Regions:
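C-terminal output helix
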Residues: 101-110
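Alpha4 helix (beta4-alpha4-beta5 surface) of REC/receiver domains from two-component response regulators
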Residues: 59, 80-95, 108
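The short loop immediately C-terminal to the conserved phospho-acceptor aspartate in CheY-like receiver
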Residues: 49-52, 79
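Conserved phosphotransfer cores of two-component systems
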Residues: 38-40, 64-70, 91
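Active-site beta3 strand of CheY-like receiver
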Residues: 40-46
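Acidic catalytic/metal-coordinating carboxylates
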Residues: 29-32, 55-59
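Two-component/phosphorelay signaling modules centered on CheY-like receiver
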Residues: 6-25
Length: 115
């Protein structure tokens, strides 16, 4: 999970606490997320869009999709306008979800891609 908000990262981690087959890695911004992506080679990436630094969620998504490990990317944002969703999908997102998301929503999304 890539999000600059520590509470969101904690909520995602706790959502998967009972899912023994899921290991959650956390990054605080797009740069750290991209580095972690290359180190860990995850099965799926959940990322916020609006983050500080040089790499936002849209750029992160594009870079992941351009890599050899084209894992699914779920963009999660407070921005829910159709134009925002279109930008996310154009960046290569497999799913675009608007915050807030329930733990069961997160689990269902991940299971759809990793089952």
């Amino acid at each position: 999970v890539v999000d600059d908000n520590a509470l969101i990262r904690t909520l995602v981690r706790l959502s998967f606490k009972r899912q023994s087959h899921v290991e959650v890695f956390e990054a605080v911004d797009g740069s750290e997320g991209l580095k972690l992506f290359h180190e860990v080679q995850p099965d799926i990436v959940l990322s916020d869009i609006m983050m500080p630094g040089e790499i936002d969620g849209l750029s992160l998504c594009k870079q992941i999709k351009a890599s050899e490990n084209k894992c699914p990317v779920v963009l999660i944002s407070a921005k829910g306008q159709q134009s925002d969703i279109d930008l996310g999908m154009a960046a290569g997102a497999d799913v675009y979800k608007v915050k807030p998301l329930s733990p069961s929503d997160l689990i269902l999304i991940v299971e759809n891609f990793t089952a």
